[in-house]
């Protein structure tokens, strides 16, 4: 099985300065030391990761975040920092740029009212100011925005895009929308459902065409490949992949802050611990193999598009308790 050119997400801490309602952050209180993170990166070298996402918690909480970025850049050509941005100072930004950081991905979950509902009162305006600061160095580092779409903000997607792109001193290279994955806190009130997920896809189609001259609007939803089958197959061939769509355990893995390896940041099943095992051994874990071979159940298992879509394994796990089950929100 082919495992090179994966994207690696590593949670360098579970600590955070916010308490967002939809947060996936775990209760693991042990954070790897810098030496342990270096050990992890050394174990990943042979797999030649396409990109490394440094995440958390809030990674800027760590005093050694600049050193982590430096070590990441030795491993992969692309390093992305996932952050809420509120702890970012201009001096720290300069240090991160000097360390080789390629992208800063800032979380913004809709207009001010929706964002503050999720992340806390006053956080939207503070985040906007931080993005203006980042943009001062736009010739040295790229700004991404990551936005989680749920029931409370799906009707404001275009208004949000328009507002963000019209703010002076902010140049967004990529604006990525992510579907809300149910959790115990907001499962019943924010889950999109079939109609909501269909609306998300339709909104994306409109926004991508309408704002293509201003920014790149993307989404990680697997079902989009069904409507772009030819392109999906070309990507499989280009990167020598067994399948595309849901990237969990296929062309991406997640490493938690204690070294636990999971197929995805939102799929909380342990497949091993990279501090105690080598990655090749972990990738041969039975659960990883089942996902990679698309040994799916229900509607997803019978679907002719499972090699280019596969549904969302995290959604199946959160809703049905089985990561191989069908994605109940599929609108196809």
Model feature map: region roles:
Residues 4, 48, 139-141, 246-247, ...:
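Residue-level preference for beta-strand/loop junctions
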Residues 26, 55, 107, 175-178, ...:
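Conserved residues at the C-terminal ends of beta-strands
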Residues 1-103:
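Conserved alpha-helical substructure of the radical SAM core
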Residues 243, 260-261, 265-332:
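Flexible mid-to-C-terminal extensions adjoining Fe-S/redox cofactors in radical SAM and related proteins
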